[in-house]
A protein has these predicted regions:
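FMN-binding flavodoxin-like domain, especially the glycine-rich phosphate-binding loop
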Residues: 2-29, 34, 39-132
Length: 132
């Protein structure tokens, strides 16, 4: 049974997002489908953020973050991780978290990089799931 209030959002890393969604009993959607309705109706979001080689968010993620920032995020919970690409530095990633917090969001997990060998999906999901 899916936990409809948890939404895992991905761009090109669909298989990884679906694995996380299965572990959480959540729904997974493409970032290209993200709109105000999803943001308003969801309670918790797991964001599989992707960066371009220049260190900027991909265009789809840039648009999605604009959507998040235009919506009241009070009481909503977010866990973010880098699914693809290299984040230029930790401050860049924290800026995303800070923008979500400004909208009222609570960050329950922030920006480990899934491409690092030390990153373990199951461990990360276990660490965030009680707080989603």
């Amino acid at each position: 049974m899916k936990h409809e209030s948890i939404i895992v959002v991905y761009d090109s890393c669909q298989a990884l997002a679906e694995e996380i969604a299965d572990l959480l009993g959540a729904e997974s959607i493409s970032v290209q489908s993200m709109n105000n309705r999803y943001v308003e109706n969801g309670q918790s979001f797991v964001l599989a953020v992707e960066y371009q080689t220049d260190g900027h968010l991909t265009p789809h993620w840039q648009y999605a973050f604009q959507t998040f920032c235009r919506t009241d995020l009070s009481g909503k919970k977010f866990a973010l991780f880098v699914a693809l690409g290299n984040i230029p530095d930790h401050d860049t990633g924290m800026e995303l978290c800070d923008e979500l917090r400004k909208g009222g969001a609570h960050i329950v997990g922030d920006l480990p990089n899934a491409v690092y060998p030390s990153w373990k999906l199951d461990n990360w999901v276990c660490s965030i799931s009680p707080n989603l």
